[in-house]
């Protein structure tokens, strides 16, 4: 039985997008079985005291964009850093992903 690789991700997270672009190669190299684990950040932040992006200080928001640009360039993954409709309500999409995983 192959080892499992649990991938915890947020559907509308640019960080999850960057990570997802690396998963295929990682699974191919390791032979691991990929298990998708969607996470709803608002629930996680509420439980852990984290701040949603809109509630973070402007300096932290700016640094986040700077780091996303760096990682995007480093990984060679094109990314639109400030999309018009971000963040979007992902609850329906998460439910769909969970239903697909359980099917």
Give the positions of each predicted feature:
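Extreme N-terminal starter segment of soluble prokaryotic enzymes
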Residues: 1-6
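Structural alpha/beta surface segment adjacent to cysteine/selenocysteine redox centers
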Residues: 11, 18-103
């Amino acid at each position: 039985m192959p080892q499992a690789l649990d991938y915890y991700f947020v559907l509308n997270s640019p960080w999850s997008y960057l990570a997802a672009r690396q998963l295929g190669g990682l699974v191919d190299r390791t032979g691991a079985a990929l298990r998708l684990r969607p996470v709803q950040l608002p629930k996680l932040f509420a439980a852990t005291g984290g701040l949603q992006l809109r509630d973070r200080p402007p300096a932290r928001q700016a640094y986040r964009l700077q780091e996303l640009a760096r990682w995007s360039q480093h990984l060679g993954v094109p990314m639109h850093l400030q999309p018009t409709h971000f963040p979007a309500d992902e609850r329906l999409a998460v439910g769909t992903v969970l239903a697909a995983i359980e099917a």
